[in-house]
Amino acid sequence: MRTISLIVLIAGISMLMLISLKTQAQTPTDGFAMSKGEICLVTDYGQTTWKEYWEGTRLRENLNLGTFQSNMIMPMAGYGLNNRLNLFAELPYICTSSTAGQMTGMKGWQDLSLSAKYKLIKKKNDQGTFYTFLTAGVSFPVSNYIPDFLPYSIGLGAKTLSGRVILHYEHKTKLFATFQTGYTLKSNIETDRQSYYNEGQVNSNEMPVPDVWDGAFLLGFNNIRFRVDMHYNWSTSTSGSDIRPNDAPYPFNKMDAQWIGVSGLLWIPGVKGLALHASADQVIAGRNVGKAFTWTAGVQYVFNPFKKSAQ
């Protein structure tokens, strides 16, 4: 028997197997923005591992699977089209494996995500500054991977359309708080199976993938040298079925998760725009997902090739 992998959508774009890979670079889901002409280049490496998983709401192990592991490299690019609108592109490469059993993991390029973040409101007073951002995004597979081979699949194979609202407040003491939430629509997919379970047998090879509502709360500190935060995230499928006892998972399963974590960013002295960032997250509650621990680390470089040097 196979178990379910941790498949949680962050931030409104398709990030399967690895949670909370949105570290402290400028991203579509945070409360920070690039100025006009700025380019942000990011490369992240991350790893997720889990041994226990929720079969429905029951937490259990599977000795035939052992410890499941997913590794990911994700390049990302961001561009400040103007002082209000930022554009982003991301494409993760994922490799999956387990320590027991006879199943072979999968690897490859997953889904290309394209998104835009718009600064709708900026209000400043003597105590701090309040921002409201709106984010919209799409994603689609770029390789012919198999989605119905969980937990080893590198993705669910669905095209997505997402929208998000971000509320961000920065106090004059450099403390900040962020709340963001979004909804992701997912397309149906075609599988090799001829039927699946949805409160009864459905005789079709076309399978719906549940939409997702997700969000996060962050509290942190940000200055010109470094940034740190602690966060709580959730992701909830709006439909789907539970993994049945002694049955294999599939993309229509209802996948819910809550996780907590910390992350940070350090600007490198002497190299303008260069920073290192890292994060660590632990799933604390779930449904049809792995009880996973995820860590990530990466490097980012922010520069403006169009800005004229001061005379």
Give names to the regions the model predicted.
Residues 47-72, 148-153:
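Surface-exposed strand-loop-strand hairpins of Gram-negative outer-membrane beta-barrel proteins
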Residues 43, 75-79, 89, 114-118, ...:
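Residues on the lipid-exposed face of transmembrane beta-strands in outer-membrane beta-barrel proteins
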